[in-house]
């Protein structure tokens, strides 16, 4: 590939994602799609640490005159999350120059990717998603909504719902995430959805939720995922108030193992919190993200402060600095602090005060905590991501070597050879005692599958189908 060059550079005002002030940043747009910002104009274009660094590949651009004239918004992907970044410049001409340059780079990258996909459908793991998976469904009959019994509602969000289902043919239980296409397409979430599908397909780790099938109907996308019914860690912790250090060490080790795996594949999870940590029926961790807790992105005019849980935000995310893998180690610090101390390390109902605590306040520990536990949590909750435990080039290995985890055999962790400290009291795979009663008490309302023909595609209007090419997938093609 040819050398990466600068397409455009200059000063722009960037709006904070969480703390909504404007900051001057010197941005460079490069041919590889990177859009990187610095506090000062860099003397050397290969400076190692830009404050802001994201890709304009597959981005969408919007122009608006609010909250300031000559504003433009870039909406793009960070793993499975759609993010928006807001900029403004002094003149309409300047804005036009930036948006045209960004669009041109994004279009060229799109063409290059299409050419690559046509040339080598299965040569890279990143591209397995659509080609190989679609091929696999030619040997295994494509799944439809008729293939499942719909048992209980497990969760609900902006884009759809998660339902406990039973596969008729095998009798196995799964969690099916059903997304309405109109909602996703209306909110420009197609890229997000397809990326999430590809990430799930390529993910194989004992402590990460795996995808069994994905398919589409006329108006829905369906992900059929591994189902674990041991309940959210949040549920168990709120019942017991605190976990012992041994129990926390067990869960912490399984989380570190999973994050190490993701990071080795250049994926930052970014959303670690108790609600996304579940237990399987044996008491092992499963990191899930049914993608329903994110409340979507509002339009540019309303600029909702944030989606997600502010208590878990790392300082570098709050300050709109570039962030990488170390953001996950901050998240690990917060969840392990909660487990051992029974409360969040930083909390205030007033979000402005909460942000100030996250950025400025030192953490305090209960006297009962061991020195190893204090040392681990202090290291994980260092404000500067470059100084944080795990923030160096060794990433997870740095945490694995910490004295808190001494005596842990990491291969045994991965192989599930360690005995879980708690076994959920579930009587069967359909036992949903650990799920939120608000959901499990509801009756399930989805359009009856009989309304679809066997393919589930009959009468598909040409308006919607092209957004989701080759979406079907069956894991059995790989096993």
Swiss-Prot record:
Its EC number is 2.7.11.1. It comes from the Eukaryota. This is RAC-gamma serine/threonine-protein kinase. AKT3 is one of 3 closely related serine/threonine-protein kinases (AKT1, AKT2 and AKT3) called the AKT kinase, and which regulate many processes including metabolism, proliferation, cell survival, growth and angiogenesis. This is mediated through serine and/or threonine phosphorylation of a range of downstream substrates. Over 100 substrate candidates have been reported so far, but for most of them, no isoform specificity has been reported. AKT3 is the least studied AKT isoform. It plays an important role in brain development and is crucial for the viability of malignant glioma cells. Interacts (via PH domain) with TCL1A; this enhances AKT3 phosphorylation and activation. Interacts with TRAF6. Interacts with KCTD20. Interacts with BTBD10. The modification Phosphothreonine is found at residues 305, 447. Residues 148-405 form the Protein kinase domain. Belongs to the protein kinase superfamily. AGC Ser/Thr protein kinase family. RAC subfamily. Residues 5-107 form the PH domain. The modification Phosphoserine is found at residue 472. PROSITE patterns: AGC_KINASE_CTER (PS51285), PH_DOMAIN (PS50003), PROTEIN_KINASE_ATP (PS00107), PROTEIN_KINASE_DOM (PS50011), PROTEIN_KINASE_ST (PS00108). It comes from Mus musculus (Mouse). Disulfide bonds join 59-76, 293-307. Residues 445-479 are annotated as: Disordered. GO terms for cellular component: ciliary basal body; cytosol; Golgi apparatus; nucleoplasm; plasma membrane. Disruption phenotype: Results in the cytoplasmic accumulation of the master regulator of mitochondrial biogenesis, Ppargc1a, and a reduction in known Ppargc1a target genes, which leads to an abnormal mitochondrial phenotype in the brain tissue. ATP binds at residues 154-162, 177. It catalyses: L-seryl-[protein] + ATP = O-phospho-L-seryl-[protein] + ADP + H(+); L-threonyl-[protein] + ATP = O-phospho-L-threonyl-[protein] + ADP + H(+). Two specific sites, one in the kinase domain (Thr-305) and the other in the C-terminal regulatory region (Ser-472), need to be phosphorylated for its full activation. IGF-1 leads to the activation of AKT3, which may play a role in regulating cell survival. It is a peripheral membrane protein. Phosphorylation on Thr-305 and Ser-472 is required for full activity. Phosphorylation of the activation loop at Thr-305 by PDPK1/PDK1 is a prerequisite for full activation. Phosphorylation at Ser-472 by mTORC2 in response to growth factors plays a key role in AKT1 activation by facilitating subsequent phosphorylation of the activation loop by PDPK1/PDK1. Its main location: nucleus. InterPro entries: AGC-kinase_C, Akt3, Kinase-like_dom_sf, PH-like_dom_sf, PH_domain, PH_PKB, Pkinase_C, Prot_kinase_dom. Isoform 1 is expressed in prostate, testis, uterus and mammary gland and isoform 2 is expressed in prostate, testis and mammary gland. Changing residue 219 to V: Enhances kinase activity and causes low seizure threshold, sporadic tonic-clonic seizures, brain enlargement and ectopic neurons in the dentate hilus and molecular layer of the hippocampus.
């Amino acid at each position: 590939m040819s050398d990466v060059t600068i397409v455009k550079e200059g000063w722009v005002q960037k709006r904070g994602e969480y703390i909504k002030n404007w900051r001057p940043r010197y941005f460079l747009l490069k041919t590889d799609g990177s859009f990187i910002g610095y506090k000062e104009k860099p003397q050397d274009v290969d400076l190692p640490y830009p404050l802001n660094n994201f890709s304009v590949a597959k981005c969408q651009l919007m122009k608006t005159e609010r909250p300031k004239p000559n504003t433009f918004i870039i909406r793009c992907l960070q793993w499975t999350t759609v993010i928006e970044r807001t900029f403004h410049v002094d003149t309409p001409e300047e804005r036009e120059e930036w948006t045209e340059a960004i669009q041109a780079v994004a279009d060229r990258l799109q063409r290059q990717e299409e050419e690559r996909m046509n040339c080598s459908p299965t040569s890279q793991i990143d591209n397995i998603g659509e080609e190989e998976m679609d091929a696999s469904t030619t040997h295994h009959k494509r799944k439809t909504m008729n293939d499942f019994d719909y048992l209980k509602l497990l969760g609900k969000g902006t884009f759809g719902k998660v339902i406990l289902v039973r596969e008729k043919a095998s009798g196995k239980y799964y969690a099916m995430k059903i997304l309405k296409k109109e909602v996703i397409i209306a909110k420009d979430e197609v890229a997000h959805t397809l990326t999430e599908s590809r990430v799930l397909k390529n993910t194989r780790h004992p402590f990460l939720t795996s995808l069994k099938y994905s398919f589409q109907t006329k108006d829905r996308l369906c992900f059929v995922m591994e189902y674990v019914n041991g309940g959210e860690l949040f549920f168990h912790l709120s019942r017991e108030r605190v976990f012992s250090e041994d129990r926390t060490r067990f869960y912490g080790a399984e989380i570190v193992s999973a994050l190490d795996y993701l990071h080795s594949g250049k994926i930052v999870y970014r959303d670690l919190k108790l609600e996304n940590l579940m237990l399987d029926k044996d008491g092992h961790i499963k990191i899930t993200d049914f993608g329903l807790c994110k409340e979507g992105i509002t339009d540019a005019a309303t600029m909702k402060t944030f989606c997600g849980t502010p208590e878990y935000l790392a300082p570098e995310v709050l300050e709109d600095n570039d962030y990488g893998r170390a953001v996950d180690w901050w998240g690990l610090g917060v969840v392990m602090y909660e487990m051992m101390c029974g409360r969040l390390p930083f909390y205030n109902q007033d979000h402005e005060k909460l942000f100030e605590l996250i950025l400025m306040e030192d953490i305090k520990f209960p006297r009962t905590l061991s020195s190893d536990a204090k040392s681990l949590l202090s290291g994980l909750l260092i404000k500067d991501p470059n100084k944080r435990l795990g923030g160096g080039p060794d990433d997870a290995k740095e945490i694995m070597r910490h004295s808190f985890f001494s005596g842990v055999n990491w291969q045994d962790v991965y192989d599930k050879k360690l005995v879980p400290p708690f076994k959920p009291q579930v009587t069967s795979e359909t036992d949903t005692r650990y799920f939120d009663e608000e959901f499990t008490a509801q009756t399930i309302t989805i359009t009856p599958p009989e309304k679809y023909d066997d393919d589930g595609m009959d009468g598909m209007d040409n308006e919607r189908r092209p957004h989701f090419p080759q979406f079907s997938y069956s894991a059995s093609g790989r096993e």
